[in-house]
Amino acid sequence: MENVPNVYFNPVFIEPTFKHSLLSVYKHRLIVLFEVFVVFILIYVFFRSELNMFFMPKRKIPDPIDRLRRANLACEDDKLMIYGLPWMTTQTSALSINSKPIVYKDCAKLLRSINGSQPVSLNDVLRR
């Protein structure tokens, strides 16, 4: 056999030569501030309308039924009539859902059962 030289490998430990200046407290603060800034921008982009609604004063939305509170119901024969509507000056026939006048056999008796001898307002009927 030939004489083959033996090669021995020894582990080599190399110390890192870079300094750990990247991990200083000052650098971390900048990264944290940048992340917080990005988070605020994302919150603003995705929740802009919600933030505007939160900081704006709430508008009072008028109740559409408030205009009907002064209206009263009355009977003309067997026909139910409404008077006192703000946009109408005369007595008008009350209409059902299918836009036909409401005709009830004992109309006056029905109104007395709702509010006794007092005039029946539309508000009394809507609250029941």
Curated annotation (Swiss-Prot):
Family matches, as InterPro entries: Poxvirus_L5
GO cellular component terms, A-Z: membrane; viral envelope; virion membrane
Keywords linked to the UniProt accession: Disulfide bond, Fusion of virus membrane with host cell membrane, Fusion of virus membrane with host membrane, Late protein, Membrane, Signal-anchor, Transmembrane, Transmembrane helix, Viral envelope protein, Viral penetration into host cytoplasm, Virion, Virus entry into host cell
Transmembrane segment boundaries: 31-51
One Pfam entry name: Pox_L5
Primary role: Component of the entry fusion complex (EFC), which consists of 11 proteins. During cell infection, this complex mediates entry of the virion core into the host cytoplasm by a two-step mechanism consisting of lipid mixing of the viral and cellular membranes and subsequent pore formation.
Annotated protein name in UniProt: Entry-fusion complex protein OPG094
